[in-house]
């Protein structure tokens, strides 16, 4: 159970588990950290999994809970890097090869690909789910669709 492929059962079970996390008692950050841990544990190549919260007034992203190597990118201006680009576009950004990305903020020399899922609540951009991989072209269509559903599920806790 380390990669989705076309495994609809795995996908459904994962979404159900994330719904259970969201519906538990506890703080938002505790729930988000548990979701990070789940994604990191269940998917090979999800090497850094974390959330950035949106400060729409300052037009910047603020680092939230994450699993993986520490990052110096605690605040990211909208438009800067892959995360900042997703904040501006409001759409998922999937980068197969970060080395070919001119607007890339390097978090680690090991990172090869990245996917960022914007999260909205009542039409307002509130956060992002950011996942880095040490594998090139790690995130396929199945993973993208799954992660976008994760974003929809967790939007209620913002």
Which residue ranges define each predicted feature?
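Short hydrophobic/aromatic beta-strand element in the GNAT-like acyltransferase core
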Residues: 48, 116, 128
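Juxtadomain coupling helices with adjacent low-complexity linkers
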Residues: 2-3, 11, 19, 133-158
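Short loop/turn motifs at secondary-structure junctions and domain boundaries
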Residues: 43, 107-111
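Intrinsically disordered, low-complexity terminal regulatory regions
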Residues: 1-66, 70-71
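A short, aliphatic-rich beta-strand micro-motif
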Residues: 113-120
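Regulatory sensory and allosteric helical modules in signal-transduction proteins
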Residues: 54-106
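Sensory-domain boundary capping and coupling elements
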Residues: 120-133
């Amino acid at each position: 159970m380390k990669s989705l492929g076309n495994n609809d059962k795995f996908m459904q079970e994962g979404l159900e588990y994330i719904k259970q996390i969201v519906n538990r008692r506890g703080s938002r950050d505790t729930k988000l950290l548990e979701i990070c841990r789940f994604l990191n544990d269940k998917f090979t190549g999800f090497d850094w999994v974390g959330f950035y919260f949106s400060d729409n007034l300052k037009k910047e992203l603020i680092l939230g809970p994450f699993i993986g190597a520490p990052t110096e990118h605690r605040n990211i201006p909208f438009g800067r890097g892959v995360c900042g680009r997703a904040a501006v576009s409001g759409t998922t950004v999937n980068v197969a090869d970060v080395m070919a990305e001119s607007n890339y903020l390097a978090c680690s020399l090991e990172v090869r690909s990245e996917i960022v899922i914007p999260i909205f609540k009542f039409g307002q951009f509130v956060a992002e789910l950011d996942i880095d991989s040490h594998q090139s072209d790690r995130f396929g269509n199945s993973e993208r669709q799954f992660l976008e559903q994760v974003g929809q599920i967790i939007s209620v806790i913002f």
